[in-house]
Amino acid sequence: MTQMEYIPIISDSTSSFKSYDPFPLELGGELPELKIAYRTWGTLNAQKSNVILVCHALTGNADADSWWRGMFGEGKAFDETKDFIICSNVIGSCYGSTGPLSLNPKSGKRYGPDFPRITIRDMVAAQRLLLQSFGIEKIKLVIGASLGGMQVLEWGAMYPEMAGALMPMGISGRHSAWCIAQSEAQRQAIAADAEWQGGWYDPAQQPRKGLAAARMMAMCTYRCFENYEERFGREQREDGLFEAESYMRHQGDKLVGRFDANTYITLTRAMDMHDLGRGRESYEAALGAFTMPVEILSIDSDILYPKQEQEELARLIPGSRLLFLDEPYGHDAFLIDTDTVSRMACEFKRQLIVDN
């Protein structure tokens, strides 16, 4: 599968930012050139003070109005009548930004497994370049969950002068051994597929079984025991499959039709490197240096990023506020109960106005 084949999935409203200057990477090396796919909603005001930056999760893209639809609308978290909302596809992904499916200008061939190791900090540095192209010097609110929440926190550490307020959801300040183990198991599922070929597979014949298995494993951590029991129980279909089995297979097949195996490995490895304290004085000092308003959303039923991790963030970030989403949906609750998440974000935005 080539990047061109993803175009039908990408909205016609998607724009591209291109930089032909070498883009240095945190772990060494560089990208010879950079392309960032992004979308915007609303109008940037004259003061450029109404910017909301939305950061997407692992398999997301710039089409935030599709995967986070319930957050958009007048009077909601992302109000196009008042806000200028921007969401970019992270580098390393496969929805229009530079990633493993892109052509390496030095070789004329796709990067594939030779795509350089990237980090969350590289993603944020690329987003900053995009915002600077608009002349934006201050972001009213940076918001996101999961991988998006990692980006939100790094905005606070890397560019505190730009990040006016942060709302990270369902995330920790450093990737746990539990999460790293989950990601490695998923990567090994991909590598076990005979079509993997060390990552040099034909793009039209990627390791579908391995990628589907990786997605199924991930889906077990995106929900929770109560959710699966209530939704599926021990119900069986006419073909003999348990409903839970059928759901897993459906989720695996669905991802294979819209994602790339090398991309999955690139992004999960970037997540493994997530640690606000890495290369800084200490983890505690990095979070303790935050001075902007921060509202942390924790999901009670999240087994991937359990609430003690958000409680730790709240203890270490001065003046931060911790909210709980009490829903039996697991980690994915931020995508499901958008009414509550939007209401919390709106209240945070109103408080920012009062405080200013």
UniProtKB/Swiss-Prot annotation:
The keyword Iron does not apply. It holds the Pfam family Abhydrolase_1. It comes from the Bacteria. Its EC number is 2.3.1.31. GO terms for biological process: homoserine metabolic process; methionine biosynthetic process. It catalyses: L-homoserine + acetyl-CoA = O-acetyl-L-homoserine + CoA. It is found in: Cytoplasm. One of its GO terms (molecular function) is homoserine O-acetyltransferase activity. Keywords: Acyltransferase, Amino-acid biosynthesis, Cytoplasm, Methionine biosynthesis, Transferase. Substrate binds at residues 215, 332. One of its GO terms (cellular component) is cytoplasm. Pathway: Amino-acid biosynthesis; L-methionine biosynthesis via de novo pathway; O-acetyl-L-homoserine from L-homoserine: step 1/1. Residues 50-335 form the AB hydrolase-1 domain. The keyword Zinc does not apply. The active site is at residues 146, 302, 331. Homodimer. NCBIfam families: homoserO_Ac_trn, PRK00175.1. PANTHER family: HOMOSERINE O-ACETYLTRANSFERASE. Belongs to the AB hydrolase superfamily. MetX family. Transfers an acetyl group from acetyl-CoA to L-homoserine, forming acetyl-L-homoserine. This is Homoserine O-acetyltransferase. It comes from Chlorobaculum parvum (strain DSM 263 / NCIMB 8327). The gene is metXA.
